[in-house]
Amino acid sequence: MIQIGKIFAGRYRIVKQIGRGGMADVYLAKDLILDGEEVAVKVLRTNYQTDPIAVARFQREARAMADLDHPHIVRITDIGEEDGQQYLAMEYVAGLDLKRYIKEHYPLSNEEAVRIMGQILLAMRLAHTRGIVHRDLKPQNILLTPDGTAKVTDFGIAVAFAETSLTQTNSMLGSVHYLSPEQARGSKATVQSDIYAMGIIFYEMLTGHIPYDGDSAVTIALQHFQKPLPSVIAENPSVPQALENVIIKATAKKLTNRYRSVSEMYVDLSSSLSYNRRNESKLIFDETSKADTKTLPKVSQSTLTSIPKVQAQTEHKSIKNPSQAVTEETYQPQAPKKHRFKMRYLILLASLVLVAASLIWILSRTPATIAIPDVAGQTVAEAKATLKKANFEIGEEKTEASEKVEEGRIIRTDPGAGTGRKEGTKINLVVSSGKQSFQISNYVGRKSSDVIAELKEKKVPDNLIKIEEEESNESEAGTVLKQSLPEGTTYDLSKATQIVLTVAKKATTIQLGNYIGRNSTEVISELKQKKVPENLIKIEEEESSESEPGTIMKQSPGAGTTYDVSKPTQIVLTVAKKVTSVAMPSYIGSSLEFTKNNLIQIVGIKEANIEVVEVTTAPAGSAEGMVVEQSPRAGEKVDLNKTRVKISIYKPKTTSATP
């Protein structure tokens, strides 16, 4: 634990502890380099700092997060190591997590839930295009800023933690409520697993609770692939069917029925509150699968020892064929109740055995495997003896420099310690060749010539120092903008690892961002700051009932385009504006009351612009009081503010009797 008030990593003054996860602590700190800007510093716990697998995965996942630059993803600002402690710094979000927000405001309105889920989907779209699957999406990992902006956090870190200690089932309890059916069955998490979790989160926003709960992780996991999703509308009647259908499709148990991508889900979500989908039917999938009824695999004797004692004893007492427990020969007329009780008891025992076997099948996907022993720190001879004793074969020996592990001792195994493998599998040993490394410094902001000279002094070969130029309006030419290896990385001189320095040069081009969904005023200001001439920014308005006025609907050129500010290339932004004209519906045959209500409440025609007249002639079969004529006709465009609508109601002539 870091002392409050301490300056950590020579840069961060620790203010207070604000979080404590399964394997890391989170502190609020002030970045002294950035004039005291508040950041959140996440530090890997001391007991995991000596675990090379945990450290390597922490660093790898942190770098992956650093590449995700998106307004709805918590931004990583720094990664490093201080006194043997792995850490990462990220933007501090001064707000609530979505779990707490739901608890205080449930159920969320349809509009707010759609807005928040839309932001989450945009964040995950970027992650998925970068090949990153979150695997642990839940409301606790979604932060809300004071203005209601959603930001996704903890990309992959939770997964790296869980893989280091597979026996810590408590770490699963926090996210099993959002676990996809395929993950519950033991399959690898995919993009569609993230989509399932977002569907469960969406359900929770609109109802105030999770759909599946129970006393244990096993009970909850079983429900994910056995129990149908409870109806959202039954609990929250204000939810339209089109919106519930988004949740139904996102949480489909079969992958073939589920959204294939977050983009597909985002498009469907965007129109879920549209008037055009008001009469949509409920989605119903056939979720039955042969996999649900297949024969249970044979359970080994070693696996049976893991069943709780009560279950194991019950299995020994069960009979071979319960259906033959009572026959004509064994029937005793003097005590029928006793035998009926015995029969029920035997059936109950058989059921318990079946349930136990089912749980073993679910929780032990590879019942014949055993965990690889942890031989880190042992000599090669000791490690070989330990592995052979566990019935593993010895594979290749590889050497690797290490700052912490003594020469000739084991750094790690491949596959890693704790990983399940079958007996007889060859296990490779990674042996320390001693110290042959140095710590990478922070080169950003320094002159590239000085950095190159420093690296050469540390014996880094010329051919491993690569310079890449990048245009910049903000930094002086020749200044290092980025470095491929973060500050604090241990650089091994025995490996041909390239160091890439991105150096500033005078800018003439910019990368266009994704402006769709953003406010046009903000985007125009941003483009001007990037030296795009105002006369080259063209705004085209387009009516929309789905997008908020002033929001960008389309852009040209598209996101990611390299734009040369020195050339007169026009940027066109299509901006949403309020709908002022619609196609006239047909009211022929409708009642006057229905027609007026529909025109005023649904179409948006002002009551003062509606004229009702009575006519005495009408087509045969017309009922009195029904609309027989309308102007404008059905399908014609009407201006909601100017067009006058004329409705003709059939009123037959009354004939008086002749005296």
From Swiss-Prot:
Disruption phenotype: Disruption of this gene results in a strong reduction of bacterial growth, and increased antibiotic sensitivity to penicillin, cephalosporins (e.g. ceftazidime), and vancomycin in vitro. Cells lacking this gene are highly attenuated in virulence, and demonstrate an elongated shape and very few division septa separating the daughter cells. The lack of StkP does not disturb FtsZ ring formation and does not affect the expression level and the phosphorylation status of FtsZ. Gene3D superfamilies: 3.30.10.20, Phosphorylase Kinase, domain 1, Transferase(Phosphotransferase) domain 1. GO terms for biological process: division septum assembly; regulation of cell shape. The chain crosses the membrane at residues 343-363. Residues 366-433, 434-505, 506-577, 578-651 form the PASTA domain. Keywords: ATP-binding, Cell cycle, Cell division, Cell membrane, Cell shape, Kinase, Membrane, Nucleotide-binding, Phosphoprotein, Repeat, Septation, Serine/threonine-protein kinase, Transferase, Transmembrane, Transmembrane helix, Virulence. It is found in: Cell membrane. This is Serine/threonine-protein kinase StkP. It comes from Streptococcus pneumoniae serotype 4 (strain ATCC BAA-334 / TIGR4).
